Amino acid sequence: MINFRKTLPLLKIINHSFIDLPTPSNISAWWNFGSLLGMCLIIQILTGLFLAMHYTSDTLTAFTSVAHICRDVNYGWLLRNLHANGASMFFMCLFLHIGRGIYYGSYLYKETWNIGVILLLAVMATAFVGYVLPWGQMSFWGATVITNLLSAIPYIGPTLAEWVWGGYAVDKATLTRFFAFHFILPFIVTALAIVHLLFLHETGSNNPSGINPNADKIPFHPYYTIKDALGFMLLLSVLLLLTLFSPDSLGDPDNFSPANPLNTPPHIKPEWYFLFAYAILRSIPNKLGGVLALLASILILLIIPLLHTANQRSMMFRPISQTLFWILTANLITLTWIGGQPVEQPFIIIGQLASMLYFLLILVLMPLAGLLENYMLKPEW
């Protein structure tokens, strides 16, 4: 009998990617987040598609169209809350996925890592333009503050900001184009995710030990399909618990008020997943400096492969690097907390110290720890 799975061109690609794929036998639950991100993306595209059928991207009706979805559309409240909280789950998985990559040295697959950083930027752009669409107070003022940062770019800045706005301020033209961007970007993200997977399958997966796993590999199906299925169920359970019991806990109360350009909210802040970058932006008392620090806080991921000094790939057997990694994690949580606080003491100084420590850890301390651990591995030590 002909095995179509191995002969038909399209099925052959799927077979080599998800069924007969040779996978290291020792990869842990930290390797589940790639598939969980794929599931999050599918959930976001499906719920977003149904929301787009009822949403209107006009300043006069955007807010009421979202209210209409929640009140009058069959299960509209569920679609909207799944979409909003699905974004939070997406970023939670994204941060854990990146953290895993840093801890286990997966960034040494440079092509996969660089595509991943581009993916992160694309997902962040998607989430930002999406947050503007309900046209609540925080949507409007968040869009105003963040797009205004473009005007800090020397010479072309003010023109660039007006070009993005489609006028002299955030208005109808901005909302319409942001809806268009929010519709197209997830499909670009999907294409990038396929390229990400393509580059990963050129080298094969990394594993917790960081050593070459070619001597001990097992087929992806059934071992890791069942493991991924468990991850799917756990993530869906958390998402549904959040959506059904506490759907607004991660949102901002100001977004329940329609956008009003004449009334500025007391504390303008983005969604929780951007707060760490927002804290770094605010910690520098200069507009252009803040924008550069904001960009650097994300783009620093691109140079992490160049800063790898250790002889071992993974941090599994490197206690000093492990300690610094968890300090970095705590530092990012601190930055997230600071980003949600008002601009006053002691939050200003804490934010500035945490921002300095963030760059110091990645650029100086972690590479030095790698060199020290190399020295400690020598027999004379």
Swiss-Prot record:
Its cofactor is heme b. It holds the Pfam family Cytochrom_B_C. Binds 2 heme b groups non-covalently. Its main location: mitochondrion. Heme b b562 binds at H83, H182. It is a multi-pass membrane protein. GO terms for cellular component: mitochondrial inner membrane; respiratory chain complex III. A ubiquinone binds at H201. Keywords: Electron transport, Heme, Iron, Membrane, Metal-binding, Mitochondrion, Mitochondrion inner membrane, Respiratory chain, Transmembrane, Transmembrane helix, Transport, Ubiquinone. Heme b b566 binds at H97, H196. The keyword DNA damage does not apply. Component of the ubiquinol-cytochrome c reductase complex (complex III or cytochrome b-c1 complex) that is part of the mitochondrial respiratory chain. The b-c1 complex mediates electron transfer from ubiquinol to cytochrome c. Contributes to the generation of a proton gradient across the mitochondrial membrane that is then used for ATP synthesis. Belongs to the cytochrome b family. Heme 1 (or BL or b562) is low-potential and absorbs at about 562 nm, and heme 2 (or BH or b566) is high-potential and absorbs at about 566 nm. This is Cytochrome b. The lineage of its organism: Eukaryota, Metazoa, Chordata, Craniata, Vertebrata.
